[in-house]
Amino acid sequence: MPSFGENPEETIIREIEKFVSEHPGNRKPEPDGIPYYDTPLVGFADANDNLFSEFKDIIGDFHLTPVEVLAQSFPEHTASWDGSSVISWIIPVSQSVRESNRKETRCSSKLWADAKIHGEELNIQLQEHLASFISEQGFLAIPPILSPFFEVLQLDKVGSSSNWSERHVAYAAGLGTFGLSGGLITTQGIAMRCASVVTSLKLNPTQRSYSDFREDCLFYNSDTCGRCMERCPSGAISQEGHNKDLCMVHCAQVMQECDYNAGVPSV
C-alpha cells in the first residue's frame, strides 16, 4: 500500500488533523488569534455498508450510495468497488466561539459568523486536499458534494434535501446520532462542520457505538431536555422535529439584518 503503510487510517487522521490545525483560516486574525475549530473527529465506513442502501428508504431514492458516487465519478473503472471506503470527519466549533454565541437570541455572534464563513472555506479545501492526497498514492477519491452530480432538491414533505447528506454519512461512520433539531450529536457536541470523501482505498470501518439513530438525544431517550426548541428564535424546532422552511426564512432575514461579512478577510 503506497506510503500509507500498515495503518492507513492513522495516516488519514493525521493528515486531516494537520490540515485543520495549520490552515490560516482556522484562527481569528491577530491580536486575538482565537481558533475557530478544534481537533477533528474522523470515522470510516465500508462503502458497501447496507446502511447506505437503507438511506434511500429513509431520505429518498435520490440519495446516492458511496458505490454510486464512485461509479458516476469514475466510469472508466470497470472492476468491483468491493473494499472501497468512506472517510467522514467532524470539525468541532471551539469553546471560545460557542461561548460568544450563547448570549445571542436572534442573530449569531460576529465570532460565530466569522467561524462559519472560514469554516466552510476550510472544509471545502480540506475535501479537495484529502482527495488529492489519496489520489497521489494511486487510489481513486472524490468528495461527493464537490462533484458535478451533487444537487439539492426541494421536496414537498421535508423541504430542502440533498442527494448526499454529510450528517447521515457521519452517522454511518460512527461519529454521532441525531437530535430533535436534526443536527448530529457528536462526542464534542452538536456545533460543528462535517464533510466526507469516498475512495477506492480500503480502510477499516469505525465501529458504531450506538444502536439507535436518536440514541444520544435526551428528548427522545428520556423525554427530557428540549432546549433546542426553547433556543430556536424562529420556532422551527418542535416536538415534530425541524421545519426547514421556517429555518431558512429566518436565516434569510437575519442575513439582511446583520452585516456578517464586515471585516472578514478572505482566506
Where are these regions (language model features)?
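Catalytic cores of enzyme domains
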Residues: 105-267
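Non-catalytic, usually N-terminal nucleic-acid engagement modules in DNA/RNA processing proteins
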Residues: 1-116
